[in-house]
């Protein structure tokens, strides 16, 4: 399988840089997979789990929003936060979800709608993490 260059950058660090076979990205308009020679695209990413596939191995990384750009140079993801699933503190993540639920009471209108949408994304990540841990 042909490879391409992938960079995952967050404000704290360069979370990943290297040649990969495929990257599955949680897009705001739907998840999408990137392979070598993918058409150029810029997409907003939602909070979710980004999957990097190299030589049959998968690495899962939690991203909490950002931008993905596919160009002739490869794929670059600028993520608000990027944490490997292996390094994620599940208890702290659960506490964040709980705090987000509590904060809903003080919101209304479009602010409430955005908070519910973000909470749904976080709960989906939490569900995927729980399902992964069981296997």
UniProtKB/Swiss-Prot annotation:
**Topology class, membrane:** Peripheral membrane protein
Pfam families registered for this protein in UniProt: ATP-synt_DE_N
An example of a Gene Ontology cellular component annotation for this protein is: plasma membrane
Where do transmembrane segments lie in this chain? none
- Record flagged with keyword Membrane: yes
Q: Does the keyword Cell membrane apply?
A: yes
Provide the GO MF annotations for this entry: ATP binding; proton-transporting ATP synthase activity, rotational mechanism
Where does it localize? Cell inner membrane
Record keywords, A-Z:
ATP synthesis, Cell inner membrane, Cell membrane, CF(1), Hydrogen ion transport, Ion transport, Membrane, Transport
Name the InterPro entries on file: ATP_synth_F1_dsu/esu, ATP_synth_F1_dsu/esu_N, ATPsynth_dsu/esu_N
Q: Which PANTHER family match?
A: ATP SYNTHASE DELTA/EPSILON CHAIN (PTHR13822), ATP SYNTHASE EPSILON CHAIN, CHLOROPLASTIC (PTHR13822:SF10)
Function, please? Produces ATP from ADP in the presence of a proton gradient across the membrane.
* Family (UniProt): Belongs to the ATPase epsilon chain family.
Assembly and interaction partners: F-type ATPases have 2 components, CF(1) - the catalytic core - and CF(0) - the membrane proton channel. CF(1) has five subunits: alpha(3), beta(3), gamma(1), delta(1), epsilon(1). CF(0) has three main subunits: a, b and c.
The name this protein carries in UniProt is ATP synthase epsilon chain
Please name the source species.
Answer: Rhodopseudomonas palustris (strain BisA53)
**GN (gene name):** atpC
